[in-house]
From Swiss-Prot:
Pathway: Glycan biosynthesis; glycogen biosynthesis. HAMAP family: Glycogen_synth. One of its GO terms (biological process) is glycogen biosynthetic process. This is Glycogen synthase. Disulfide bonds: none annotated. GO terms for molecular function: alpha-1,4-glucan glucosyltransferase (ADP-glucose donor) activity; alpha-1,4-glucan glucosyltransferase (UDP-glucose donor) activity. Its EC number is 2.4.1.21. Keywords: Glycogen biosynthesis, Glycosyltransferase, Transferase. ADP-alpha-D-glucose binds at K15. It holds the Pfam family Glycos_transf_1. Belongs to the glycosyltransferase 1 family. Bacterial/plant glycogen synthase subfamily. Synthesizes alpha-1,4-glucan chains using ADP-glucose. The gene is glgA. It comes from Pectobacterium atrosepticum (strain SCRI 1043 / ATCC BAA-672).
Amino acid sequence: MRVLHVCSELFPLLKTGGLADVAGALPGAQIAAGMDVRVILPAFPDLKKGIANLQVVRELDTFAGHVTLLFGHFNGVGIYLIDVPELYERAGSPYHDPALYAYADNYLRFALLGWMGCEMACGLDHYWRPDIVHAHDWHAGLTCAYLAARNRPAKSVFTVHNLAYQGLFAAGHMANLHLPSDFFQVYGLEFYGQISYLKAGLFYADHITTVSPTYAHEITLPAYGYGMEGLLKTREEEGRLSGILNGVDETIWNPTHDPLLTNHYSREALANKAENKRHLQTAMGLKVDDKAPVFAIVSRLTSQKGLDIALSAIPDLLEQGGQLVVLGAGDADLQEGFLAAAAEYHGQVGVQIGYHEAFSHRIIGGADVIMVPSRFEPCGLTQLYGLKYGTLPLVRRTGGLADTVSDCSLENLADGLASGFVFNDCSVGSLSRAIRRVFVLWSRPTLWRYVQRQAMAMDFGWQVSAQAYGALYQRLHTH
């Protein structure tokens, strides 16, 4: 089966969020599972620079200008790049200028991405044509609309990584998109008088997936649906909406051979984790103390991530003898709040503003608990890294967090299912009660190590996701 992924980012060459991790790992896992998989992206500078020996496949004139379609390989995966320098040759973020203003021509830049995804299914590359076109997030949403306009030359899957980003553009651009004008309606890609690239994907795809089963249901509810819940509820009832968990790239995230860790360790030999903890305490200016559990936050500092309630719970956490490490950047008031806590509780709280991939590995390899108290979380990767590294996740029961972490309740401990700490309400009180449960388990070291080993034994490798997508593709292809 031939599968084409249509997306805008690719780890490690270009990353602004979790979408890049998926695009960087899922295709390789699918190839290992026996599928013939390629990826198509805009030729952003970091991608062009990072992919060697690019060859010209086709040159063509389009509604968005002259396109050179390039092809090369990266990490064993075939990559197509859509080269239009006047659209994509811009330094920095692929979506906005240095002043953080979205590019005015984003409607055209990402319409072309969708159109090229569709053209690939129509035979643009004479030597390779996909059976399934798999589009990701709003940037690729128009792919599904173009396929529908061309009588569906391939089956389409649209994956929502985060429904909050909708790709909204003025209705006047419809004339420039090379789509039938009657697609601009409620039963189409119109959304409150604008064009929504996200809705185009949701409405026209043969099947919609999200990155966890719980999030797939949550987005059919008004609280999580961002106005799309009616359409998504219909797709759920039609059996055209499902959730498939993201995976962990074990070539990058594995404590037995992670090159970014000072000391390696495994499920069977956990002693070196304590060494990593001492290094972390020293690096963050904390008191070196084996008996103090180190809680960690590695995240964008936003209220979506529930970090306002985490900030309010700090005194409670420290009173019971814990320490806190924070790595992230985001809302100015949250940054200031965490920095103020570090100044007030010197030796107990360490904060680094910014994001450093290498340091995130050292934090997760050295901490005892990783906190992910999100208001909503489509999948979440941080808690999966925590499980893999025996750094027990403390999470709110939402989205992918609900699907991947089992609370250390007495029955879960007895059944060998416990892997972390889960709380329900997005409130300081609910989080504080979960923190209290952390300390109760921490006071029983044998039980703590038992839960660590349970967590580290869980399999969230990409091969599991690859098989689930493979089964979905097969079902679509044969119907």
